[in-house]
């Protein structure tokens, strides 16, 4: 049963009784636990969002109810913990962040599973992935060393690899130098960029500005051109255009990322040279796996040529010969299917217009004869 004090706070928060306050009231509100970040705490029953001061539910700094609970648990705010649980917050999220025995015991009293920390951590991580709860996951795991250490090394890296290969996580620092704390932060940050979760991205970019370059790199690699546009033009974050293009080409089928780097001014011939140097046709891979790899690789080669890259430069021809790839030599001899595509020749930087153009291109492209020929040549080379 909640105390009169808790019930009173609950009513005051729900009615936003302190939406108008005097500066002299701030200290009192803080001492009473009625202050949230930048102003008196408020709660929207419809959106299930906890706010501070005049912020709206859509504000980047507003909190979903479960996140608000985690924050209250970390700060040992007993009354707020009770209030948030009464509104429907999941108490097991709270027990994962309890720093004191008293707060942990309170979580158990409010319904948390005493064995959750022993048996529920793995499933909770997977649940947060499925629900795309990026900010909640970061609130729970980041700087929560006791929780991170409770995963053995194998389980932890299985979780990190659950959705991704880890290539992009180590772009800006060596694997052996990265702490679990940083790795889990970048895992969820990358997740937000991959699924284009705008609010989490904006929140994290504000909180972790030291990852700005990495954020741009990740957006390029994943083809999130909305985020590339935002970082490049609204935040003035810069990378070498050719480095950006190499990142875009490193992901198979990344038409959006490749096109956007081209539109910004990256050198297409250098990109094609890099792609050719990555050629894996001569590797000993058999069956459908080999064809899948080659198809993905060739799609980027073909797209760069469609944008205007010249496959007949001396350097590219020399690279093909050095790779001893008869298949690439034969493919590049088919000049009728290796030419710029008319749909792709305009340089457009508005993300929505780029998507429309790429969609039009995909409905008209002639990649399939090229790919069919490649498959035929690969099969003949076996």
From Swiss-Prot:
Disulfide bonds: none annotated. It comes from the Viruses. GO terms for biological process: taxis. Belongs to the asfivirus MGF 360 family. Plays a role in virus cell tropism, and may be required for efficient virus replication in macrophages. This is Protein MGF 360-4L. It comes from African swine fever virus (isolate Portugal/Lis 57/1957) (ASFV).
């Amino acid at each position: 049963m909640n105390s009169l004090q808790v019930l009173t706070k609950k009513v005051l928060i729900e009615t936003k009784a302190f939406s108008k306050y005097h500066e002299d009231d701030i200290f009192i509100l803080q001492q009473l636990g009625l202050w949230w970040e930048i102003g008196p705490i408020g709660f929207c029953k419809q959106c299930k969002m906890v706010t501070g001061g005049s912020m709206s539910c859509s504000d980047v700094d507003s909190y979903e109810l479960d996140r608000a609970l985690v924050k209250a648990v970390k700060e040992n705010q007993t009354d707020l913990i009770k209030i948030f649980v009464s509104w429907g917050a999941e108490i097991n999220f709270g027990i994962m962040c309890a720093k004191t025995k008293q707060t942990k015991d309170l979580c158990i009293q409010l319904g948390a599973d005493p064995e959750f920390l022993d048996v529920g951590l793995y499933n909770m991580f997977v649940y947060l992935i499925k629900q795309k709860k990026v900010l909640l996951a970061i609130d729970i795991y980041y700087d929560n060393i006791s929780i991170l250490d409770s995963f053995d090394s194998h389980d932890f890296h299985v979780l990190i690899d659950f959705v991704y290969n880890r290539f992009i996580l180590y772009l800006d620092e060596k694997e052996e130098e990265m702490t679990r704390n940083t790795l889990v932060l970048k895992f969820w940050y990358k997740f937000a960029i991959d699924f284009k979760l705008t609010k989490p991205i904006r929140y994290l970019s504000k909180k972790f500005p030291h990852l700005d370059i990495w954020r741009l790199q990740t957006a390029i690699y994943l083809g999130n051109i909305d985020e590339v546009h935002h970082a490049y033009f609204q935040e003035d974050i810069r990378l070498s255009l050719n480095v950006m293009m190499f990142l875009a080409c490193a992901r198979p089928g990344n038409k959006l990322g490749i096109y956007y780097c081209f539109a910004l001014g990256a050198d297409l011939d250098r990109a094609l040279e890099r792609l050719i140097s990555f050629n894996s046709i001569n590797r000993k891979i058999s069956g459908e796996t080999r064809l899948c790899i080659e198809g993905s690789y060739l799609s980027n080669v073909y797209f760069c040529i469609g944008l205007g890259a010249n496959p007949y430069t001396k350097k590219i021809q020399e690279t093909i010969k050095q790779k001893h790839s008869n298949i690439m030599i034969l493919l590049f001899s088919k000049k009728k299917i290796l030419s710029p595509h008319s749909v792709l020749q305009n340089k457009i930087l508005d993300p929505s217009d780029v998507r429309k153009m790429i969609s039009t291109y995909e409905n008209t492209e002639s990649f399939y004869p090229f790919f069919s020929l490649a498959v035929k040549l690969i099969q003949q080379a076996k």
